[in-house]
């Protein structure tokens, strides 16, 4: 292994909200009894760098174990289904820091007096030093955990805003300008962890949960700042089928699978669901991108919004409220029997075991469709009014970018110009503006110039109008050849080039 290898691994596609699960998975697997974890975001050592701290009060590692855990040629341990201290840990360290920013691991067994500390970046040879003082004591020694004494393991990484911003989306797209404060990251990671670790964070009948994840200095929705424990997030239903129990035989093993599906109660699920009283941003939005079921491996949610990977159905607005959980009991399965992608960021569809499970689910459990589909009907009536008032040709659910997204209502003004209309039954946010722009760019690429793009919604934030104004001051995206032709027509006057014309409109008549 050379230094070039470390750089290559650091550039893999792994959003930070998935990479950051690795320390938590390690903590869950390397603890005896109740799990106590901490995740903090602090200013980095330089401007525009952000520090992320994880700590736990579990079993820790001795000097041999920490040395082994950082060896790229070594495999993870077999302790538990989440495994510990393997390639995933190194993935996290490299992806977070891009192998150019500081990191360290300090760990010890509970009975040891000093920490075994390793500083990054990675090199072919690295030193382990001993340290008796608790690293970052002012951050990790919070009042809630002081009775537990010193942490067993502390991991610190620094990242730039581009990397940090991949926590703020589901697909890992990069938008460093969105990292406006550390609390944006705290709120986002609370949502991701609240979904992925909900079964660990859910209190039992006595009020105690198997695991706690503390986030220090968290700004609540009411403006108060305090240390808080991550809240588990479960979808809530307005209609649900009974749980079906399947036994899937594959490769000599009977795999117990439980399936629950139904229709999402979007308003009840989203309202104050995230730690601190915030609404959901990434999950259970009641739209096409979040429709589908969660995949649960043991107690860990490893994938959400699964639809066409299981059923032979394309995403469609009538499935916007379709949700549920496929839970796989892995207690009697060998370690690694069902493969996942790096850091359990998703299912590995090349593993035939998953195909066997999904085929069994598809045969036994139908997709639940919202037959009323009130928003789609509302859009249909809107389209009819356009045709009656203007005589223009209108298309519903128009596919853009080879069916990767759809426009609710597309009005053809003539052969070369159109108006775009989209509808949503929940509050509009920055994603709504991004969706409008995606639809605009898609029509441009398909040879039809939009004149306007409007999103009708039940409510919107105060800054969305300003965001639209900023975008509307920009020249639209287009290929170089089209830009060259447009400049020629405009005789070099950029003011005459096609600009965006996006608008978010509140329509109180929209069905909710």
Task: Describe each PLM feature range.
Residues 1-43, 47, 64-70, 338, ...:
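Bergerat-fold GHKL ATPase/HATPase_c domain
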Residues 56:
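Acidic ATP/Mg2+-coordinating residue in the GHKL
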Residues 59-60:
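Glycine-rich G1-box
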Residues 68-81:
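Bergerat-fold ATP-binding/catalytic subdomain of histidine kinases
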Residues 80-218:
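GHKL-type ATPase core
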Residues 99-114, 424-425, 441-488:
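Nucleic-acid nuclease catalytic cores
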Residues 239-381, 385, 389, 403:
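Charged regulatory segments coupled to nucleotide-binding catalytic modules in large multidomain enzymes
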Residues 308, 387-415, 427-430:
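Active-site metal-binding core of divalent-cation-utilizing nuclease and nuclease-like domains
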């Amino acid at each position: 292994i050379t230094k070039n290898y470390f750089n290559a691994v650091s550039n893999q596609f792994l959003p930070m909200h998935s990479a950051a699960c690795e320390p938590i998975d390690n903590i869950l697997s390397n603890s005896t009894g109740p799990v106590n974890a901490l995740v903090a975001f602090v200013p980095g050592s330089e401007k525009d760098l952000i520090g992320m701290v994880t700590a736990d009060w579990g079993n820790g590692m001795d000097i041999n174990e920490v040395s082994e855990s950082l060896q790229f040629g070594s495999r993870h341990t077999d302790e538990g289904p989440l495994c510990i201290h393997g390639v995933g840990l190194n993935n996290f360290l490299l992806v977070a820091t891009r192998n150019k920013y500081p990191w360290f691991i300090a760990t010890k067994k509970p009975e040891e007096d000093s920490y075994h500390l390793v500083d990054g970046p990675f090199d072919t040879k690295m030193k382990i030093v001993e340290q008796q003082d608790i690293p970052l004591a002012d951050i990790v020694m919070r009042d809630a955990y002081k009775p537990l004494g010193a942490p067993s393991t502390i991991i610190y990484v620094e990242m730039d805003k581009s990397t940090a911003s991949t926590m703020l989306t589901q697909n890992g797209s990069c938008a460093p300008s969105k990292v406006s404060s550390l609390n944006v990251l705290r709120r986002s990671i609370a949502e991701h962890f609240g979904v992925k670790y909900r079964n660990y964070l859910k209190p039992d009948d006595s009020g105690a949960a198997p695991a706690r994840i503390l986030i220090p200095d968290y700004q609540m929705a009411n403006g108060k700042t305090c240390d808080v424990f991550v809240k588990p997030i479960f979808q809530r239903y307005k209609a649900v089928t009974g749980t079906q129990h399947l036994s899937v035989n594959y490769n000599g093993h009977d795999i117990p699978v439980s399936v629950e599906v139904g229709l999402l109660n979007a308003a009840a699920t989203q309202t104050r669901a995230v730690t601190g009283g915030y609404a959901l941003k990434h999950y259970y939005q009641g739209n096409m991108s979040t429709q589908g079921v969660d995949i649960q491996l043991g107690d860990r949610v490893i994938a959400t919004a699964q639809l066409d990977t299981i059923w032979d159905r394309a995403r469609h607005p009538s499935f916007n409220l379709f949700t549920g959980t496929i839970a796989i009991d892995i207690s009697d399965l060998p370690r690694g029997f069902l493969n996942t992608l790096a850091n359990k960021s998703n299912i590995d569809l090349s593993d035939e075991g998953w195909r066997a499970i999904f085929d069994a689910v598809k045969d036994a459990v139908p997709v639940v469709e919202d037959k009323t589909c009130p928003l789609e009907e509302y859009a249909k009536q809107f389209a009819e009014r356009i045709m009656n008032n203007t005589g223009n040709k209108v298309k519903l659910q128009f596919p853009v970018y080879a069916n990767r997204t759809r426009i609710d209502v597309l009005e053809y003004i003539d052969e070369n110009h159109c108006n775009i209309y989209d509808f949503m039954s929940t509050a509009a946010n920055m994603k709504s503006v991004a969706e409008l722009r995606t639809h605009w760019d898609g029509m441009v690429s398909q040879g039809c110039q939009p004149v306007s793009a409007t999103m009708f919604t039940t409510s919107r934030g105060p800054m969305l109008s300003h965001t639209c104004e900023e975008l509307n001051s920009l020249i639209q995206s287009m290929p170089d050849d089209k830009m060259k032709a447009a400049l020629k027509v405009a005789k070099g006057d950029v003011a005459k080039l096609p600009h965006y014309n996006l608008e978010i409109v509140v329509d109180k008549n929209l069905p909710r």
